[in-house]
């Protein structure tokens, strides 16, 4: 890294700032949701859509980001991503209704979807291959700091200013990043194949309408007939994509990917697994504030041990997987995460608040081990010519499953509770207890998928550096 030219190091800093903005925004909102609900005159049970609108937009737009960067140029697309993200942040802060906020979050999601993958592509183009891993470690480090600062910073801003400031802080950073991108980043382009627009639209429609239908009549205000229509449209769109992709070498995601058994199992497990674990970052600060009466800042601080546990476990997860094999690790961490979820609920309802940081630290460790294992299992056996496509599909599924998880968590709260819940009441705690029990059950279900993974430790080693560089 030290022998890189000055202009290359500046370009890496620009990418790192983009990673930081995107990762900070995924966590800073969570602790502000109850305050947003009060300010906008909405029930806290509806606020999960603030997260879903962002994450679902990222999932929908991800497949197009790499192609756009190759076609239009990495500088142009990265600049556009920062501008859209910054404008979305401004519109979020100016929103006076929930619907306005959801539209602004979707605009943020378009920028966020392009920022991270185009940033990775930029690093691949400006850094020699032998220094790629060191450069990626450098630019992704701020992305790890973002989730650490996000909850506490969000709580601090909400408690001592207002929720609008969790979006306003993005504006000066975004302006500086946009100017620096235009001045310092080269506009690399590559010859591209024809973009599969038909496949992209079919997948986008299928994902969006099915997630919207899952929110139910209470969340969307739609009639049962309209929701049934959405489900039908979504299913038809996905079936049409499968027919479109069959024997189509130019399909957005080739069906040849699923001939690799570990990819199929890993992708199915990642989808189901992240539905369950995607509920936790949303539900935990909401439960701490509405169910237990914590202040926004205190609730944000309570999330830090979970992030620390996750970061600490990444250092040894490869050794753990190589020692015990993917099947044992994934089944154990899936069931373990379910048990830790129950332990958190029990500890909180008993009033043992001093134990909660240790439980959340353990939750972060278990979750991190499972995430890393799921990712490497999914990609490790793919042939080199399918590695990039498989990585893109996995990234899309990760975002989609998290949006579905948050949607289901909001649906569970709506099923067990009324439209308005009061802070720190017995009824509210009962609602959260039933919701948490349901979440623990959902989190445990992917163990049935992971139990089918071959348990040959020598074959199921962590993904090689050669394949990582090919993605």
Swiss-Prot record:
Question: Which keywords does UniProt give here?
Answer: Cell inner membrane, Cell membrane, Membrane, Transmembrane, Transmembrane helix, Transport
List the CDD domains: MFS_LmrB_MDR_like
Q: Which residues form a coiled coil?
A: none
Transmembrane intervals: 12-32, 49-69, 77-97, 102-124, 138-158, 165-185, 197-217, 225-245, 263-283, 286-306, 342-362, 396-416, 431-451
Membrane topology classification: Multi-pass membrane protein
Select a single GO molecular function from the record's annotations and give it.
transmembrane transporter activity
Q: Which cysteines are joined by disulfide bonds?
A: none
Q: Which domain of life is it from?
A: Bacteria
Which residue spans belong to the Cytoplasmic compartment? 33-48, 98-101, 159-164, 218-224, 284-285, 363-395, 452-471
Location of the protein in the cell: Cell inner membrane
The record ties this protein, via SUPFAM superfamilies, to:
MFS general substrate transporter
Question: One GO term of the cellular component aspect?
Answer: plasma membrane
Periplasmic-facing ranges = 1-11, 70-76, 125-137, 186-196, 246-262, 307-341, 417-430
Matching entries from PANTHER family are given as: BLR6921 PROTEIN, MAJOR FACILITATOR SUPERFAMILY MULTIDRUG TRANSPORTER MFSC
NCBIfam families the record matches: efflux_EmrB (TIGR00711), PRK10504.1 (NF007799)
Which family does the UniProt entry place this protein in? Belongs to the major facilitator superfamily. TCR/Tet family.
This one is known as: Putative multidrug resistance protein MdtD
Organismal lineage: Bacteria, Pseudomonadati, Pseudomonadota, Gammaproteobacteria, Enterobacterales
């Amino acid at each position: 890294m030290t022998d890189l030219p000055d202009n290359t190091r500046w370009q890496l800093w620009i990418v790192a700032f983009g990673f930081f903005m995107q990762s900070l925004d995924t966590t800073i909102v969570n602790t502000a949701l109850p305050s947003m609900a009060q300010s906008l005159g909405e029930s806290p049970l509806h606020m999960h859509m603030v997260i879903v609108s962002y994450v679902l937009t990222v999932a929908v737009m991800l497949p197009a980001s790499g192609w756009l960067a190759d076609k239009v140029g990495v500088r142009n697309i990265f600049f556009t991503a920062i501008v859209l993200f910054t404008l979305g942040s401004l519109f979020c802060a100016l929103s006076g209704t929930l619907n306005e906020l959801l539209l602004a979050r979707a605009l943020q999601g378009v920028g966020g979807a392009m920022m991270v993958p185009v940033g990775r592509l930029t690093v691949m183009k400006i850094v020699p291959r032998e220094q790629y891993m060191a450069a990626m470690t450098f630019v992704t480090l701020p992305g790890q700091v973002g989730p650490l600062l996000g909850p506490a910073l969000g709580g601090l801003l909400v408690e001592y200013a207002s929720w609008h400031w969790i979006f306003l802080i993005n504006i000066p950073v975004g302006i500086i990043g946009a100017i620096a991108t235009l001045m310092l980043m080269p506009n690399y382009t590559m010859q591209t194949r024809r973009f599969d627009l038909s496949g992209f639209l079919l997948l986008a429609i299928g994902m969006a309408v099915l997630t919207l239908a899952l929110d139910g009549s209470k969340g969307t205000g739609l009639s049962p007939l309209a929701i049934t229509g959405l489900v039908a449209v979504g299913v038809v769109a996905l079936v049409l994509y499968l027919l479109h992709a069959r024997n189509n070498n130019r399909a957005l995601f080739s069906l040849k990917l699923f001939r690799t058994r570990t990819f199929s199992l890993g992708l199915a497990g990642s989808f189901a697994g992240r539905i369950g674990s995607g509920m936790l970052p949303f539900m935990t600060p909401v439960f701490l504030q509405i169910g237990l009466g914590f202040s926004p800042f205190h609730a944000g601080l309570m999330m830090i041990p979970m992030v620390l546990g996750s970061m600490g476990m990444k250092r040894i997860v490869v050794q753990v997987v190589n020692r015990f094999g993917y099947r044992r690790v994934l089944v154990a961490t899936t069931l373990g995460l379910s048990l830790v979820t129950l332990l958190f609920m029990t500890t909180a309802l008993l009033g043992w608040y001093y134990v909660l940081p240790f439980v959340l630290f353990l939750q972060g460790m278990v979750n991190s081990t499972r995430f890393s294992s799921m990712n490497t299992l999914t990609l490790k056996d793919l042939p080199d010519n399918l590695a990039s496509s498989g990585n893109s599909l996995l990234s899309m599924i990760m975002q989609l499953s998290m949006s579905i998880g948050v949607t289901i968590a909001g649906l569970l709260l709506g099923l067990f509770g009324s439209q308005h819940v009061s802070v720190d009441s017995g009824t509210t705690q009962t609602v959260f207890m039933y919701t948490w029990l349901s979440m623990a059950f959902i989190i445990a279900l992917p163990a049935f998928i992971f139990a089918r993974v071959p348990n040959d430790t020598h074959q199921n080693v962590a993904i090689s550096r050669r394949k990582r560089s090919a993605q």
